[in-house]
Amino acid sequence: MHFHPVTIGLVSGIVIALGVAPLFFLALGAAGKLSEKLRADLWTRWRSWLILAPCMVVPLVLGRLPAIVGVGILAILCYREFARATGLFRHHVISAVVALGILLITFAAADHWYSFFVALSSLTVSVLVIIALFEDEPKGYIQRVALGVFAFLLFGVCFGHFGYFANDRLGQPLMLAIVVAIELNDVFAYCSGKLFGHRKLAPQTSPNKTIGGALGALVLTTALFGTLMHFTLAGTPLDRPIHLIALGVILSFTGQFGDLVMSSIKRDLGIKDMATLIPGHGGLLDRFDSMLFVGPALFHYIGYFKGIGLDEPARIFTGL
C-alpha cells in the first residue's frame, strides 16, 4: 500500500506527540507549573487520546471504504448522543428515519454515487416531514420534525461530505490533514485565549472563548493547514497562495462555529456535555463538534476548483 508523504508525516507527528506529551507533563509538574487538578486532567485527556488517536487515524489510513465506514459510524454515534440529549430518541419513527438517512448517505459515499448522495438530503427531509404525521399528534409536530431534520443535516449531510472525500485519490492525506488541523484549531484557540484573550467572544454561549483566542486560532490554523494543503494538493489548481489561505480560513472559521453551535445547543438544554463516554472530553459529539461544518465547506470549495473523485470509478456497487 502506497502512502502519501503528508500521511506519513502526520501519522509520525501524532505518534511523536503522544510519546512526548508525558515528558512535557512531568517537566511542568517538576517546575511547579501545574496544579493538582490540571495535572490530573492532562493525564486523563492523554490516556483518552491513546484510544481516540488510533480510532481516528487507522480507518483513514486503511483506505477508501474503511474511511467512509468509519465516518459513518462516528455520525451514528454522535447522532445517538444528540438524540438522547434532546429527547428525540423518544420519537422512535423519526429517530429511525434519521438513522436510516445517515446509513444511506454513508452507502452513497461508499458507492461513489454522487447524484444519490445529493438527492438524499431532500428525500430524507421529505420523509421526515411526512412520517411524523403518522403519530397523529399535532402538538409538538414542528419541534419533532425540526429536531429530526436538524439532526439529519448535522450528522448525515455534514459528516457525509467529510466521508465523501475518501473517493478522491488525495482523500487519505486530505482527510487526515483536516482532522489534525481541526483538533489543533481548538488547541490554538485555547492557548491564544490564555495569552491574548481579554474580550469574550460569546459569553452567554461559551464563556471561556475569547476574541483573541478565535483570531489566534484563525492565524495559526490557516498557516498550518495552508502548508499541509500545499504539499497535499501540489500540482492541482488549488496549490496557489490565495486558495491555500482560503482553505485555512474556511477550516478555522467553520471549526469554531461548529463548536459554538454545539455549545449553544448544550446551553439551551442546560447540560455541560453531551455524554460521558470519553474521560476528560465528554462525549464523542463534544470532541468532534468542530468537524460538523468543515466537511461541506471544504468539500464544495475543493470540488469547485479541482473536483472530488473525478478520476475514480463511480457507482462501485450499484453500477455493476
Q: Where are the language model's segments positioned?
A:
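Membrane-embedded alpha-helical bundles of polytopic integral membrane proteins
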Residues: 1-250
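C-terminal membrane module of polytopic membrane proteins
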Residues: 20, 268-320
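Short amphipathic alpha-helical coupling elements at transmembrane boundaries
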Residues: 84-88, 144-148, 197, 263-270, ...
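Alpha-helical transmembrane segments that form the membrane-embedded catalytic/substrate-binding core
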Residues: 189-190, 209-221, 251, 255-258, ...
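Short amphipathic alpha-helical interaction segments
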Residues: 237-257, 269-270, 276-280
